[in-house]
Amino acid sequence: MQGIETMQKEKVDFNVLCVLSQSNVHKPKEIYKFFRGLGLDFMQFIPLSEFHPDGTPMPFTITPEEYGRFMCEVFELWWPERRKVRVRFFDNLAEALAGQKPGSCTMHETCDSYVVVEYNGDIYPCDFFVDKQWKLGNLNLDSWSEISRRVRRYNFAAKKTLAHPECQVCEYQSICHGGCPKSRHGQNRKFEDLDYFCQAYKMIFAKAVGPLREEVKKLLGHAADLAPHSISPY
């Protein structure tokens, strides 16, 4: 709380990241109102999903339906103040509908938009896959030009293109591109599986795509009135 007060005092834009678990996923209104009461304008909600070796969800893991309901209610709370409050998921969705590349890699066609650098210089393609089999190199030993051209990096990026048959005929495929490989691989260790939160995404898209598409049309029609954001708090 002291950190929030300090950054607000110094007028520093920042994002609050809220992890959704069984302890809070049933309280969307309370959480949203709490953040707004603190004067927070940039929010991000991350669904927690971890599994036992046999594929069963760990106790704190939320269900797709719970995540979908949470975000749909947040959308209703956010919509009246959408011009002054930023919720990352809805920002990314609006970017996709505007034909832009979303800020979140979850909605990208491939997983090659960033890398993770560990304390010792080791580099991995994603913070969910800090694993020996995906290590790309080390900043102390390899140049970035070498690392960026590694076959392993291309192989990882291509994992997202292993679309499940349901994705190929889904009306939202052009938005989520099969979701996050972590959520596809996490339960059964198969990249070609459906994203664990697929049902949630469909619930959210069904709720938000229509209104956001109309909003995007209005904004693009008055582009001269839009103030560009020079710094992303995400």
Residue ranges: model-predicted function:
Residues 1-3:
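Domain-scale recognition of functional cores that engage charged ligands
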Residues 5-106, 110, 116, 120, ...:
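Radical SAM enzyme [4Fe-4S]-AdoMet core and its adjacent flexible, acidic
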Residues 130-234:
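Flexible mid-to-C-terminal extensions adjoining Fe-S/redox cofactors in radical SAM and related proteins
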